[in-house]
Amino acid sequence: PAIMLIFMGLVLALIPVHAMHEVREVGLPPHVILEIFLPVMLFWETRNTSWREARTRLRGILLSGTVLVIFTAFVIAWVLHTFMGVYLWHVALIIGVALAPTDAVAVATLNGKLPKSSITTLKAEALINDGTTLVLFALALQVAGGHELALGTASGMFFFSFLIGSLVGLAVGWGANKLRAHIGNPMNFNVFVFTVPFIAFFLSEEIEPFEGMKGSGVVAVVVAAFYLTYRGPDTIKPQNRFYGLPIWSFVTYVMNGALFVLVGVQLPSAVEHMDGVVHEYNYAWALALAVIVVAWLVSIAARFIFLHVTIDIIRALDRSEKQKQLRTTFRGRVVSTFAGLRGGVSLAVALSVPTDVPARDFIIFIVAGVVLLSMVVQGMLLPLVIRWAKIPVDTTEEDEINEAVRTIIAESFDSVAEIGQEIGAPQWIIDRIADEQMYNASMYRNLHAVRKHGANAPEEARRIIEASDLEKELRLRHLEKQRSVLKRLRNERTIDTNVLHAIQEILDIEEARVLGPVELE
């Protein structure tokens, strides 16, 4: 998908039609890239991150989300500056900063390939490292502007960015949670929720108690999203949740794809201006391509070294039983290294470099090349690395879902009769709902047995699941027949198009109930 999207941008930029001449200049002001794309993308990815798992592995996540980013940025910059001829330090540093963070959206593509605990760790790391990256980016731009990089200033920027961002995120999350509880219309609800990440982001960025020491919008968005996600079951009405999730999934998918398209659109211009950059700074094209490969390899090596050394230090200092349960093998570290994909965030940082920064086109070219290598080569190697590591199949989430459903059905079963009598429902309705609950409990119990034991599951359980599959097929084909009748009525002009849409929605909801939840990531 990454290659296809960048190729689409290239096609748009190269269309030789006079009416499309302005497409070559398609783009957004650099500072707008981060302000538009990051808040929404991070808000959605935070919603899909397990807070429980993140708390369990908080120490490693914080180290990877802060120290590893700083380490990677400066190692890449040092290698490019010292050995690869990128003799402008600020250019090497900006490239290092852009390539330092892993990407939460890219990590989401690994669902089903890695254990849920690993996915959660990678997602949480990616969310935190975005905040670290933007602070480093601000420092790198100061260096590009001729300022010296002072340790005290850098430390203050990190401290206040995370402190102010966390406080603003909590405040915005608390206020938004109170307000959304009173919004009943799904459209109004989703419009309101879409404003939350922007409010958190811009409010935090505007708070600057000391010069240069402002809050992190990224941290504010992540904290607000975590708070709202945790309080969601208490304040989100079911219809708002039902209609909202597909919208969020679609918008974030389009936004992430748009970053790749924007890079593709700007590549011809970047390559055109690269001639001047190459000549002015003595970069040869072969060297520019070599810089891409070396920067990618260094990003992988830096991640592996940091993870290896950090884990060994933690093991030496913490020998508690809890820590022993979280330990990973050497092969597991290799998998974590290759799973650190670069993606949309790196592109957003590169596109956000101000136009007056020397060698901006070179920076975009290098970062786009490394992201492509990461997405394509790393992405292709990762399944092989996972198989080599022999990571066992993780059924933890599936087991928890089945256990939770069984517990919910069991503990709520008696309430059917109580509530029915309380509201005066006829006995036959109470009995029908009770029978449905018993049937659902039986189905979940047998489904869990078949998924867990496979061919070794009890014969009765396998027989019931086979019958359930036939029932699902029957219901789906019956719905298909109903839709054909509905279309015939529309074609015969017996019903209006609006009537067709209304009945279609009823049939679609029924089919969604039969098929069950769909993975949106």
State the predicted function of each range:
Residues P1-E400, L486-I506, E510-E521:
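Transmembrane helical cores of multi-pass secondary ion antiporters/exchangers
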Residues I391-E521:
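Cytosolic C-terminal regulatory domains/tails of membrane transporters and channels
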